[in-house]
Structure formats: C-alpha cells, structure tokens
Amino acid sequence: MTNKILITGASGFIGSFIVEEALNRDMEVWAAVRKTTSRKYLQDKRIHFIELDFGSKEQLKAQLGEHEFDYVVHAAGVTKCLDKADFRRMNTEGTKHFVDALIELKMPLKRFVFLSSLSVFGAIHEQQPYQDISEHDMPRPNTAYGKSKLDAEKYLDGIGNDFPYIILRPTGVYGPREKDYFLMAESIKKHIDFAAGYKRQDITFVYVLDVVQAVFLALDRGMSGRKYFLSDGDVYSSTEFSDLLKKEMGVKWMLRIVAPIWVLRIVTFFGEKLSQITKRPTALNNDKYNILKQRNWRCDIEPACDELGYHPHYKLADGVKLAVEWYKKNGWL
C-alpha cells in the first residue's frame, strides 16, 4: 500500500526538495500551498495540492478532514517578516493550530517531522575555544525567528508521546534555489565580500539534500520526542564560504571588507526602518545583526548519526560547486 505524505512549505527551498525525494520513493505526495504560492518547483503531475490556512485550527480541520496521512513533514514557516509578531503568528501559532487539528482529527500518523533550526539556541559557548552546541544545552534564542521556532518545539514537547513527532535543527542550509546565501554570490560577482566583526567565527553548514536525507531517516526510524542537529560535520572559518564561491564563479579578485559589529548594527537598524516604509521584508534586519554577531555555530550531530544513521554526503566545497552550477544554469548568475 502506498504511503501518503503531507508536506507543508512544499513550494519553498527545502520543501520542494522534500517533495522530489518523496516522489522518488513512490509515495503519494500532497503539497500544502497557499492560493498565491508559486508552484515553479512543483511541476510533477503526480503531486496533489491542498490549500491550508494555518491561522485557524477549525479551518485546518475542515481542510484536512477528508484525508488520512501516514506521514507529515512540517517545513512551512517564515524566516523574515515586516512585524516581529508575525514570526510567532506563523511559526509558533501556525504550528500549534496544525498539530491540534491533526490530533483532534485523530490523524493516524506514523511520524510527524518538524523542521526547526539551530537558531533556537542563540549565542552560547561564545568563549574560545568554542564548544559544540549540544542537546543538553539550554536554548537562549537571540532572534525573533529562533524564539518562534523554540516556542513551537516547546508546544510539541508538551503534547506527550501520543503524538509521534521528531524535531530537526539544521544549521545554515544552502544549495540550489536558496536565495539568502545567493546574495553573497551576487556580491562576490561584483568583487565585494562583506564580513562583520574581528573575533574568530566558527560556522557550520548543511547542503539541502543532506537535510532531505535526515527528514526521511526521521520518518523511517525517528523516536518520538527526539531532536537532532544537522550539519555536514565540519566547522568552517568566516571566509571559507565566500572563498569557495569566488573559486567556483571564476572571480579573479574580490575586496574583502570587514566592518566592526557596530557598523553592522547601524546598517541593519536602517534596513529594518526602510523595510517598514516600503512594506517589504528585508534580510538586513535585527535578526540578521544577531546572527552575524554570533561567533559560535558549532553543533553536535552525533545523535543524528548514531540514532538515525545520518551521514552527510556533501562537504561545503561539493555543495557550493553544485549550487553555483545551478545558479548559472538557471540564469541567476
């Protein structure tokens, strides 16, 4: 019997790759979308579409009531908003409404995978030598995004083991179709590389297909209530990503500008004010300031490796090469 899977955030960067892998596994794939959602990466005719309104539990129950899903991957969410309250409304309350609807409908789920983020921990272990952030550490999110994801995690934790959920906490996810790291590529194409802060920064990354690998491992064998960090297993300096972009793009030279943290604070302050005027979300906001200010992004992926059988296949050099090839092929660069 074919397994039926519902994927929220299906039109997004990570979600669209999850859809593709589910199709490769011959699952019956249902992609949760909004009326205004672009379906550019959801062209396969085997995909079923369902419109979901995460703002209302009762509306979700009506929309989901005629369906039975074996698996759910909740990848929907927002990473930047005009109003900080929207993070909670969409990432926290939206998740709560969704889970409550599934429970009240007695959805016969085998597993529910929630895509959270390393950002739920914020700036901890910031004194050198930096230590890996582990599941035993106390989260102290320093961004509105991280707090909204942590609050969603806490809600899931409060439900109990009757709801079979697994939480994945990827570090910075990059790859084809991703737009935020792409901004770095655009800047380097113009021979400019911008960094903030003079203190050593340890950064981690995970290629999008390794996140997808972890999602399906969690669906297959994840223990309810467990949480797993995801990275490629290595730690990088603050310049390695841009150096690899420069190499793969064939840029012969670039000017590396390292600004004090206080300059970044000014830039993001005015970026946020401009966003409020134009009514368009921007990556240059207070959350971005706290993200770039943070020095330690190490995380412990051993539990994911030991319990799920997760083994990252893409080191940063491999992933950047593939991402740049895609950017060029699709006319982004």
What spans do the regions from the language model cover?
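N-terminal Rossmann NAD(P)H-binding glycine-rich loop of SDR-like oxidoreductase domains
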Residues: I5-R25
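NAD(P)H-binding glycine-rich loop region in Rossmannoid oxidoreductase-like domains
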Residues: H48-E93, H97, L118, G122-A123
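Conserved Rossmann-fold NAD(P)-dependent oxidoreductase catalytic core, especially the SDR/UDP-sugar
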Residues: K96-A144, I166
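Active-site Tyr-X1-5-Lys
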Residues: R140-I166
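Substrate-positioning beta->alpha
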Residues: D151, E178-L183, A196-L219, G225-R226
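Conserved C-terminal active-site "lid" loop/helix of NAD(P)H-dependent oxidoreductases
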Residues: V208, D243, V267-H311
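Mid/C-terminal beta-alpha module of Rossmann-like enzyme folds, strongest
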Residues: A218-L284, A317, K321-V324
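Amphipathic terminal alpha-helices
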Residues: C299-E307, H311-L333
